[in-house]
Swiss-Prot record:
Role: Involved in control of chromosome replication initiation. Inhibits the cooperative binding of DnaA to the oriC region, thus negatively regulating initiation of chromosome replication. Inhibits the ability of DnaA-ATP to form a helix on DNA; does not disassemble preformed DnaA-DNA helices. Decreases the residence time of DnaA on the chromosome at its binding sites (oriC, replication forks and promoter-binding sites). Tethers DnaA to the replication machinery via the DNA polymerase beta sliding clamp subunit (dnaN).
GO terms under cellular component: nucleoid
Places the protein is found: Cytoplasm, Nucleoid
Species per Swiss-Prot/TrEMBL record: Listeria innocua serovar 6a (strain ATCC BAA-680 / CLIP 11262)
UniProt cofactor(s): Zn(2+)
Name listed for the protein in its UniProt record: Replication initiation control protein YabA
Length: 129
């Protein structure tokens, strides 16, 4: 092979490596997005299961006539529904996200934390009460 053919071959390989590097970067970005979505869906699933278990625990009351006719919820059923909603559930979800390695601060929300390093913005948010 002459020198020009070798140079062309090396240049071609360099272009292919550049394209592979670009594809690898795109794959990494897509993987990060899928991990974030998976985490969000897992938290939502857990939340819905908790709500379902709470609704199963509350004994179903017979439907009042007023509620059946007018679609108005009786006051004691309203209270039962309000008790099912957990206070601080959003805070618990943020803590869980942070423990799983994601930012919960408004600066980097949802992005993975590098090497599980602490973020001062996230910590200040989680320490507010």
């Amino acid at each position: 092979m002459d020198k020009k053919a070798i140079f062309d071959s090396v240049s071609n390989m360099e272009e292919q490596i550049g394209e592979l590097y670009q594809q690898l970067g795109d794959l990494k970005t897509n993987l990060g997005e899928m991990l974030e979505e998976n985490n969000r869906l897992n938290l939502e699933n857990e939340h819905l299961r908790r709500r379902l278990s709470l609704t199963d625990e509350v004994a179903p009351e017979p439907v009042a006539e007023e509620e059946a006719v007018h679609g108005v919820m009786a006051p004691n059923r309203k209270e039962a529904m309000q008790q099912m909603i957990e206070l601080g559930e959003g805070y618990d979800n943020l803590v869980q996200l942070y423990k799983e390695g994601f930012h919960v601060c408004n600066v980097h929300f949802g992005s993975p934390r590098g090497n599980d390093e602490d973020c001062l913005f996230c910590l200040s948010l989680l320490n507010k009460k």
